[in-house]
Amino acid sequence: MDRIIEKLDRGWWIVSHEQKLWLPAGELPHGDAEQFDLVGQPALKIGEWQGDAVWLIQQNRRQDMGSVRQVMDLDAGLFQLAGRGVQLAEFYRSHKFCGYCGHAMHPSKTEWALLCSHCRERYYPQIAPCIIVAIRRDDSILLAQHVRHRNGIHTVLAGFVEVGETLEQTVAREVMEESGIKVKNLRYVTSQPWPFPMSLMTAFMADYDSGDIVIDPKELLEANWYRYDDLPLLPPPGTVARRLIEDTVAMCRADYEV
């Protein structure tokens, strides 16, 4: 899986360090290795896109290192591969030594894992499961402005799964903790790998059951019910949050625009 890049190699280049991505001219590099001065670098093939290899190179470039968020407008499959590269690079960087015996680790030749040749321990990338849920009440959807997003964007509620919790229990707990309401009729919609830093978003839709909105001020600046045709600033297209909102709007239109 790991080899030295040669002059004739070409493809998509995920050059990553400390959760950053090399984006010359603001774009994901695509082309010949020589064009980007990558010949001789150790690389890992992490997939293919449109017939070309996708290579991961763990390297810090002096300029043009940016966030993977800057390539969110790429096709979903390529964005997913870019996210995979950033997450794998961070995994390899943060697991250089075995947590049990302290000896150096080396990558597996057959899977995304690191191995300890001293105590035989095996490590895999840690993925944090999260829930994200759109809640509908009649012709309205619950949207909130998060403390960490002070740019006016309103979105649906989300949170991390705790140890020993089912996804359904997480939805009920997170919604109650952040907004003070109860939900019913929970339906799974989709999932999305989310490399910020190493999450897997599991998306749901639900209906309002009971309770008044009482926000957790440590998490939210405000939350309210918004009619489907009068919405505030929303998350960008390509995010699972935006899909949930648009799906809820579509259902409201079907019910209220006869």
Curated annotation (Swiss-Prot):
Name of the gene this protein is made from: nudC
Classification via InterPro entries: NAD-cap_RNA_hydrolase_NudC, NudC-like_C, NUDIX_hydrolase-like_dom_sf, NUDIX_hydrolase_CS, NUDIX_hydrolase_dom, RNA_Hydrolase_NudC, Znr_NADH_PPase
Keyword line: Hydrolase, Magnesium, Manganese, Metal-binding, NAD, Zinc
Cofactor: Mg(2+); Mn(2+); Zn(2+)
Subunit description: Homodimer.
Residues involved in substrate binding: 69, 111, 124, 192-199, 241
A Pfam family reported for this protein in Swiss-Prot or TrEMBL: Zn_ribbon_NUD
Binding site for Zn(2+): 98, 101, 116, 119
Residues reported in the UniProt entry to bind a divalent metal cation 3: 174, 178, 219
Domain (Nudix hydrolase) ranges: 125-248
Reaction(s) catalysed by this chain's protein: a 5'-end NAD(+)-phospho-ribonucleoside in mRNA + H2O = a 5'-end phospho-adenosine-phospho-ribonucleoside in mRNA + beta-nicotinamide D-ribonucleotide + 2 H(+); NAD(+) + H2O = beta-nicotinamide D-ribonucleotide + AMP + 2 H(+); NADH + H2O = reduced beta-nicotinamide D-ribonucleotide + AMP + 2 H(+)
UniProt-annotated binding residues for a divalent metal cation 1: 158, 178, 219
Organism: Enterobacter sp. (strain 638)
Purpose of the protein: mRNA decapping enzyme that specifically removes the nicotinamide adenine dinucleotide (NAD) cap from a subset of mRNAs by hydrolyzing the diphosphate linkage to produce nicotinamide mononucleotide (NMN) and 5' monophosphate mRNA. The NAD-cap is present at the 5'-end of some mRNAs and stabilizes RNA against 5'-processing. Has preference for mRNAs with a 5'-end purine. Catalyzes the hydrolysis of a broad range of dinucleotide pyrophosphates.
Name under which the protein is recorded: NAD-capped RNA hydrolase NudC
Span(s) of short sequence motif Nudix box: 159-180
Family from the record: Belongs to the Nudix hydrolase family. NudC subfamily.
GO molecular function: magnesium ion binding; manganese ion binding; NAD+ diphosphatase activity; NADH pyrophosphatase activity; RNA NAD-cap (NMN-forming) hydrolase activity; zinc ion binding
GO cellular component, one term: cytosol
NCBIfam families named in the record: PRK00241.1
Binding positions (a divalent metal cation 2): 174
Cofactor: record remark: Divalent metal cations. Mg(2+) or Mn(2+). Binds 1 zinc ion per subunit.
GO biological process: NAD catabolic process; NADH metabolic process; NADP catabolic process
EC number, as in UniProt: 3.6.1.-, 3.6.1.22
Signal sequence, renumbered to the chain: none
